[in-house]
Amino acid sequence: MTRIEMAKKGIITEEVRQVAQEEGVFPEELSQNIAEGRVVITRNILRNIKPLGIGKGLRTKINANIGTSRDKTDIQEELEKLDIAVKYGADAVMDLSTGGPLTEMRRAILKHSSVSIGTVPIYEVAVRAIEKYGNIVKMTVDDIFNVIEEHAKDGVDFVTVHCGVTKKIVEMLKSGDRVLPIVSRGGSILADWICYHDKENPLYEYFDRLLELAKKYDLTLSLGDGLRPGCLADATDRYQLIELITIGKLKDIAISEGVQCIIEGPGHLPLNHVETNIKLQKSICKEAPFYVLGPLVTDCAMGYDHIAAAIGGALAGMYGADFLCYVTPSEHIRLPDKEDVKEGVIASRIAAHAADIAKGYAKAWQRDNKMAEARRNFDWQSQISLSFDPDKVHSMRSERPPLEDEKVCSMCGEFCAIKISRRAVE
């Protein structure tokens, strides 16, 4: 039985109890949310890692993307990025590799990782199609499902599948009323195939086959937003919403068949669209876990897109998004390096933490209360350990320490407001 099937029968597993204890929720409530598709636990039955709960009533989680490209295929560097992502707090990591030995890359990441791993199998299908047939559009239906099963057999915990990029939507896109028709790599690959063959998206047409495969491994399906807006001008348009409605229906089918689902979301959104988008998804998809890329709240933050994404992510999380995909400073520019990964993870963690505070998540509040107490007591060791980047904080304080009183910092010195006010009122 899958997790959903066990939860529907009222069976509370040790895995559920473990997640419930970590999150500070009742196992019975968590199990009910799993049964009804409001929470997922992403762990392939073939992997022995700490289970990751994502969804209603749980801490906001973050994902970091790594992986090779055709321009850079250094597996060791990607493993180092994985270590950095986990060190700074990524709850999950996705391998988005498109260059080099993809199977070797994926298996190395799975072997090396202590956290949930996700992939986008259509990337590998496309790479193999070019190698085998000389063209992406020559890939077959069996090619697609065979690669998905390979990923599942290797132990991948969740996969992005762009089931909502239907033939109807692709035909609608030809009207030309979008600035950026498709910015999803997987979505564009499937749209290209649909147009060439004049056939329906195999992931939509044969969704039952996908569910059968997912059940074998208790593989979580991340229903990808192939029509997500790639710029503010396209935000919350008809293509995005039609796809959301489509994957919402597919999600209901999946839950009824015992398969866990996450819903992926935008993308590029102006701040005043964020609340509406979260509420629409939660309504249409019946509170299924929502996984957002950012969202980026401006198109013009190149080099600083991690900041734009953190602003959007904090707001999205506050309104109910459950899973934030990080964005790095190199977004829209190049393949991220190790420093980009670190900066992206930290920015996303801050956003998720800020959202959890707004949601009233007890452990988030406890951390901030401890920081406030440490500042009151000039407890620098605690302040450093409670920060999101202790190494950086320690280094900054060491580089420019106070000249006289070690309690204060070199910004205010003897004019420290906390020191003066405590002297005055205590």
From Swiss-Prot:
A GO molecular-function descriptor: carbon-carbon lyase activity
Enzyme class: lyase
Gene from which this protein is expressed: thiC
Keywords per UniProt: 4Fe-4S, Iron, Iron-sulfur, Lyase, Metal-binding, S-adenosyl-L-methionine, Thiamine biosynthesis, Zinc
UniProt binding sites for Zn(2+): 268, 332
CC cofactor note: Binds 1 [4Fe-4S] cluster per subunit. The cluster is coordinated with 3 cysteines and an exchangeable S-adenosyl-L-methionine.
Pathway: Cofactor biosynthesis; thiamine diphosphate biosynthesis
Organism lineage string: Bacteria, Pseudomonadati, Nitrospirota, Thermodesulfovibrionia, Thermodesulfovibrionales
Xref: Gene3D superfamilies: 6.10.250.620, Radical SAM ThiC family, central domain
UniProt protein name: Phosphomethylpyrimidine synthase
Species in which this protein is naturally found: Thermodesulfovibrio yellowstonii (strain ATCC 51303 / DSM 11347 / YP87)
Described function: Catalyzes the synthesis of the hydroxymethylpyrimidine phosphate (HMP-P) moiety of thiamine from aminoimidazole ribotide (AIR) in a radical S-adenosyl-L-methionine (SAM)-dependent reaction.
Catalytic activity: 5-amino-1-(5-phospho-beta-D-ribosyl)imidazole + S-adenosyl-L-methionine = 4-amino-2-methyl-5-(phosphooxymethyl)pyrimidine + CO + 5'-deoxyadenosine + formate + L-methionine + 3 H(+)
Biological processes annotated in GO: thiamine biosynthetic process; thiamine diphosphate biosynthetic process
Protein origin, superkingdom: Bacteria
InterPro entries named in the record: ThiC, ThiC/Bza_core_dom, ThiC/BzaA/B
Pfam families reported for this sequence: ThiC_Rad_SAM
Binding annotation for substrate: 65, 94, 123, 162, 184-186, 225-228, 264, 291
Binding site for [4Fe-4S] cluster: 409, 412, 416
Enzyme Commission designation: 4.1.99.17
